[in-house]
């Protein structure tokens, strides 16, 4: 980039190139658009705003003629950010409650339960007990903050089916899982996570610019393109030339150095190594690519995390009985072996946290 920033009244060449690149990597159809922000939370805010505008177009969502406001469904244990809209779709009570009341008409549905999702859609109707139509479902294919929990592929397909039947949008939050992290450019492209379904909106951030603030969303196809009108959404620094150039350079590096493939191969090596380590503290490992969690025999994740850190390995106590492992995409075969060697030595008799 020759300029770090120009007014957002103008499009810039790096911004346009990046939008085209992301649409191509996502396999989004003609008419798709990219809306930039500076973080994952901002990407999810944009997606939720777009879903609210879409909800106003649905039958039964016009209060002026007896309708009821459209709803957005989110999943229990999901995490989408800490800004007000994203927080309203985030499950964790400890971070929600201090800021209540939050954005209305966002409801939580039990993750992984297709009957609960069906019942949430079925609540739509007129009369005293009926609710407004569902505008969108927002979910993570792998619930990262919940302990790296992949949703079942059959469940994801059922959610897509219910969205189609009820004319609702499917928003997939790829802030943690996107840009090669799970062994594909986007997690929704993995058959073992989605069965090949296509989302209506994908959000992204984190790895897209190699540490530079960048995030946003991709809306698939043209049906949503007219909903954001001039002034209805924007951000001073969103998609700035420097951020876009950083993202383009990052995507080039990931592609040229085959880091998506490396994530898949090293992730498989890591999971196999953990289960072959013989450590009785480890009961199982779950995840895709280089986003994984070790399930522990008892609730000692903070003690295990501290032990690993003292011995040269950074892991995250993502749940009381789970350690999250998310090494960089450039991690080598030798480094994975070294990590497994340290993990294998974590004492199995650590005290509960």
Model-found features: residue ranges?
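Conserved N-terminal phosphate-binding loop of PLP-dependent enzymes in the Aspartate aminotransferase
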Residues: 1-353
């Amino acid at each position: 980039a020759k300029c770090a920033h120009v007014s957002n009244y103008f499009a810039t060449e790096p911004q346009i190139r990046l939008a085209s690149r992301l649409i191509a990597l996502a396999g989004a159809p003609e008419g798709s658009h990219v809306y930039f922000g500076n973080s994952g939370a901002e990407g999810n805010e944009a997606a939720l705003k777009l879903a609210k505008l879409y909800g106003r177009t649905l039958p039964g969502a016009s209060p002026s003629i007896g309708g009821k406001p459209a709803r957005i469904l989110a999943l229990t244990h999901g995490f989408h950010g800490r800004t007000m809209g994203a927080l309203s779709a985030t499950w964790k009570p400890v971070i929600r409650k201090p800021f209540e009341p939050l954005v209305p008409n966002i409801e939580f549905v039990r993750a992984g339960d297709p009957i609960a999702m069906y019942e949430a859609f079925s609540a739509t109707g007129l009369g005293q007990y009926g609710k407004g139509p569902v505008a969108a479902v927002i979910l993570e294919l792998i619930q990262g903050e919940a302990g790296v929990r992949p949703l079942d592929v059959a469940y994801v397909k059922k959610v897509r089916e219910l969205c189609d039947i009820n004319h609702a949008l499917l928003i997939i939050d790829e802030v943690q899982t996107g840009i090669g992290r799970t062994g594909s450019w986007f997690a929704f492209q993995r058959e073992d996570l989605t069965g090949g379904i296509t989302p209506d909106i994908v959000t992204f951030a984190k790895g897209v610019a190699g540490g530079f603030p960048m995030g946003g969303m991709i809306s698939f196809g043209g049906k949503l393109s007219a909903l954001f009108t001039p002034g209805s959404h924007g951000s001073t620094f969103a998609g700035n030339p420097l951020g876009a150039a950083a993202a383009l350079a990052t995507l080039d590096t990931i592609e040229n150095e085959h880091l998506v493939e490396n994530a898949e191969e090293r992730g498989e090596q890591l999971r196999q190594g953990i289960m072959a380590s013989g450590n009785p503290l480890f009961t199982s490992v779950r995840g895709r690519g280089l986003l994984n969690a070790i399930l522990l025999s008892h609730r000692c994740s903070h003690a295990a995390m501290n032990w690993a850190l003292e011995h040269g390995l950074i892991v995250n106590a993502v749940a009381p009985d789970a350690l999250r492992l998310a090494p960089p995409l450039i991690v080598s075969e030798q480094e994975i072996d070294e990590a497994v060697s340290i993990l294998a030595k974590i004492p199995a008799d650590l005290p509960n946290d």
